[in-house]
Amino acid sequence: MRYSLLTVVFITASLLSSTVAWSSEVDNIIARKEAPAGVVFEIVSDEADLLGELLPSVKADIQKLRARFPDLPVAIVSHGTEQFALTSKNRSSEIQAHDLVKTLVQSEDVDVHVCGTHAGWYGVSQEDFPDYVDVTAAAPTQIDDYEAIGYELIVLTD
């Protein structure tokens, strides 16, 4: 039991420190006089349920960014184990993640990408994801493409 409690404390502390780090990056962008060309949130983890935990905070940060810069383009790129939460077959077990992503894409004009290469390693194809999730050939290349056009990268990892 003691080992389990220490593990929970460590994981919680790690998530909190990650949240603080990316929140300060968001605050730094908000403090600027001019908006960047866009913002891309990178999520990569080996935690299958991480999207359900992170997306509410990411959505709140997107709202903060857009309160300051209303037309700011935003993208989310997921390319770890967490991306499989967004497969159609996991919709019933990952309702919060699916609902948030669908809202972000359809109502908030946010592009959400998952990695086709990573999916392919596990026998998951583009057709296994719902229409509101874009399956990009390679997530690192997608992120590089965003950065090449001036997007600010905010990395969210476990």
Name what the model sees in each region.
Residues 43-55, 88-89:
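Short, glycine-rich nucleotide/cofactor-binding loops
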Residues 53-68:
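Histidine-anchored nucleotide/phosphate-binding helix
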Residues 87-158:
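A cross-taxonomic marker for long C-terminal extensions/tails that follow the last structured domain
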